[in-house]
């Protein structure tokens, strides 16, 4: 999956909307960015907003907030719109103003719009961190479940990190693969000003463990005293991850 990082919100241009793309939003102005982008996609547009949050086991529980069309009081999602043959009569409701993201949830806007061809855009609002210790991202499941806000916040942000560095094992990637089965998206643009570490540093526990074991094996020698120091340091590091 190709990834681009934009450090300044104003760098997003209409040209960024000419191919199927995911925007991963870690900005202080996510709602403004979404409203600005969607205004460029009118008038032929179909959208669906989802909200998702992890349960105590880390499983993402997802529901639809709104969409362009309803049938029998049930929101139609983008895949259903495509399966129905892209009926323009279903492009009834224009996208709502972007929802604000709580610290324990993530909002996804799935958009299909037409300008010479159908193009699909995903806009993912990532919650801001409510923690200060970045090491929590390595294994969120060590955290207590009550109160739930911290566990959910760290878990969601670790899933976002996983989407960029080890997507096939990220629950967020699995969710997006379920949401998007046609008009496949292979490019992610990350938009942030103050959250670069989440999208530039890999926090995968498996990779940390592999690195630690490789380091440990490379340090062991015939020196018994030094080996004891290495073992103690290894145990200390292992306890933290």
From Swiss-Prot:
GO terms for cellular component: virion component. The keyword Nucleus does not apply. Induction: Expressed in the late phase of the viral replicative cycle. Coiled coil: none annotated. The keyword Amino-acid biosynthesis does not apply. It is found in: Virion. Late protein which is part of a large complex required for early virion morphogenesis. This complex participates in the formation of virosomes and the incorporation of virosomal contents into nascent immature virions. Belongs to the chordopoxvirinae D3 family. This is Core protein D3 homolog. It comes from Rabbit fibroma virus (strain Kasza) (RFV).
